[in-house]
Regions:
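RNA pseudouridine synthases
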Residues: 1-181, 288-295
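Short aromatic-glycine motifs in intrinsically disordered, low-complexity regions
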Residues: 193-201
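A short beta-turn/loop motif at secondary-structure boundaries
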Residues: 133-137, 202, 214-216
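Short proline/glycine- and basic residue-enriched helix-capping loop/turn segments at helix->loop/beta transitions
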Residues: 205-207
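Short, surface-exposed secondary-structure edge patches
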Residues: 50-54, 223, 260
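Long C-terminal interaction/binding lobes of large macromolecular proteins
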Residues: 210
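Short, conserved beta-turn/loop elements at beta-strand boundaries and strand-helix junctions
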Residues: 177-178, 191, 215-218, 231, ...
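Pseudouridine synthases involved in rRNA/tRNA modification
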Residues: 1-31, 35-36, 81, 201, ...
């Protein structure tokens, strides 16, 4: 997979080196190392230059990047793939339930990575799988995939400064407050490699905002926005205030209404890693959650 990028340098970057300018654009150290291995990957006003060369207003910086290898140890598998958006830099997918993001010992060929690698293999395009916002196996909805190392680096830097806004929909037990915020650190539960818990002493900062959208038959449909992205954050936080997600095999194993955790990645807002245009994507409630609130159209 190849990508050519062009940057028109303004006066405010007079004297800035190419290396520092690329860092400012979100290029990681791994990207710059890779660029050094590619012939004529960095052209300034049509001529090859070193990373330490200084820029001037009016300069044209051209970046050529290419990846010729695909992800190792990921079997290309023909699985359903719901693509919401695709361009040269990113892929936005609406992930179904019962699909892990990455392969593991017990999930060798049934993951999103397998499906996406098959999608590009059939087109003859080398592709390395890079997921920006990971979802649990049974969480449905939107996830962003980077199509090359540059977009991956830029998007991950946005994640680190909370530049990607994520909104979820969940169905929880009981009648919640109209809205609220859970600010409670999360850490691993002792004796478990999977389960998390509120851990005031050793946990990492975690903040979740929620708002009730509807109530029916002892269940609340809520929207949630995250300030942080801890493992199982929504599931642990909602349980901690007495409103666990229904169908959650770890934190509330009650499958009378639904056979998986009722959690859906509903909306993503972020800046495109290359064009810098604002992007917004939404994915409607999946059928199993919609069936519990049939009158709610989101």
């Amino acid at each position: 997979m190849t990508r050519d990028l062009e940057y028109n340098i303004t006066a405010q970057d007079n004297g800035v080196t190419i290396s520092d300018y690329l860092k400012k654009q979100g290029f990681s150290h791994a990207v710059t190392v890779q660029l050094k291995k590619i012939p004529e990957s960095i052209l300034l006003n049509g001529k090859w230059e070193y990373m330490g060369t200084s820029l001037n207003g009016g300069d044209c910086l051209f970046i050529h990047f290419e990846e010729t290898e695909s992800s190792e140890n990921i079997v290309a598998t023909n699985l359903p793939l719901s693509i919401c958006y695709e361009d040269e830099d990113i892929l936005v997918v609406n992930k179904p339930a019962d699909m892990p993001i990455h392969p593991s010992m017990n999930n060798y060929d049934n993951t999103l990575a397998n499906a996406v690698c098959h999608y590009y293999q059939t087109q003859g395009i080398p592709y390395t799988f890079r997921c920006v916002n990971r979802l649990d196996r049974d969480t449905t909805g939107l996830t962003i995939l980077a199509k090359h190392l540059i977009s991956s680096a830029i998007l991950n830097s946005e994640v680190s400064v909370r530049g990607i806004s994520r909104e979820y929909l969940a169905i929880v037990k009981g009648f919640t407050e109209d809205e609220g915020t859970v600010n409670a650190p999360i850490g691993r539960k002792e004796g478990s490699t999977i389960e998390r818990q509120i851990d005031v002493l050793h946990g990492e900062t975690a903040i979740t905002h929620y708002k009730r959208l509807a109530y029916q038959d002892g269940l609340s449909l809520i929207s949630l926005k995250l300030e942080t992205g801890r493992t199982h954050q929504i599931r642990v936080h909602m349980k901690s205030i007495g409103h666990p997600l229904i169908g959650d095999f770890l934190y509330n194993p009650d499958f009378t209404k639904i056979n998986r955790q009722a959690l859906h990645s509903y909306r993503l807002r972020f800046t495109h890693p290359v064009t810098k245009k604002p992007l917004v994507f939404t994915a409607p409630l999946p059928e199993d959650m919609q069936a519990l609130f049939p009158e709610m159209i989101l």
